[in-house]
């Protein structure tokens, strides 16, 4: 609405574009991007690297049927809406995260890597009976006000020291934003060369250039879409494309 476009979004642009794990500006921009959408689309907005608008701008042929907005978000919408009546939107969001983000991302990367080094990161909590029990718990036991993992922290109050129990989340994210502006920029420039992109026929070179310039100048934090494009280009190069 007028408040979001006229006040909140201009104020958001005044926030610094941090390259760290926590980027307040990126978090607010991501939230605003999905704020007007249905709940299931807001969930997808948090999971995806590209909005449908970004895809339409980037792709050389954005008119494919499977790239239509309703088709892009169809799996998330189906998982979100085809639940028995009753669960809250937050409970449905947890379900989608477990079905998509955990299975196709976190377990594939973090947990395989940690188990390679004999570390148990998440697997003990994925015991079938335990996971089903936790899934049935009321949301208030998982999110208490703004405190996440409420019941888990209560259970470990007499086991872990307060400085461990209540410290801020420390994710496994690598410093992609800084790398793309520094040590990995030559590789990015090589893989995103206009002649290379034109030969592939997948992406519009000028649209990719716009993302690179906005990120490297510090005007925006586009680590997620640029990293996704970079990994795809490395995959294509490994296959002679």
PLM regions with names:
Residues 1-12:
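A mobile, often basic/glycine-rich helix-loop segment
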């Amino acid at each position: 609405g007028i408040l979001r476009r006229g006040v909140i979004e201009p104020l958001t642009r005044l926030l610094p574009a941090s390259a760290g794990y926590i980027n307040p500006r990126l978090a607010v921009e991501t939230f605003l991007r999905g704020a007007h959408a249905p709940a299931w689309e807001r969930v997808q907005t948090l999971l995806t690297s590209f909005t449908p608008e970004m895809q339409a701008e980037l792709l050389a042929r954005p008119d494919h049927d499977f790239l239509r907005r309703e088709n892009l978000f169809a799996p998330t919408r189906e998982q979100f809406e085809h639940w028995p009546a009753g669960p809250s939107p937050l409970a449905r969001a947890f379900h989608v995260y477990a079905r998509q983000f955990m299975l196709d991302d976190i377990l594939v990367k973090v947990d395989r890597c940690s188990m390679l080094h004999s570390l148990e990161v998440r697997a003990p909590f994925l015991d079938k009976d335990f996971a089903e029990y936790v899934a049935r718990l009321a949301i208030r036991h998982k999110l208490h006000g703004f405190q996440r993992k409420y019941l888990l922290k209560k259970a470990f109050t007499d086991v872990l020291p307060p400085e461990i129990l209540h410290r801020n989340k420390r994710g496994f994210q690598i410093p992609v934003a800084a790398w793309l502006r520094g040590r990995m920029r030559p590789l990015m420039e090589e893989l995103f060369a206009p002649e290379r992109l034109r030969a592939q026929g997948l992406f519009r070179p000028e649209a990719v250039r716009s993302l690179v310039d906005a990120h490297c100048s510090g005007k925006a934090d586009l680590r997620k879409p640029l990293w996704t494009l970079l990994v795809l280009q490395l995959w294509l190069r490994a296959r002679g494309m």
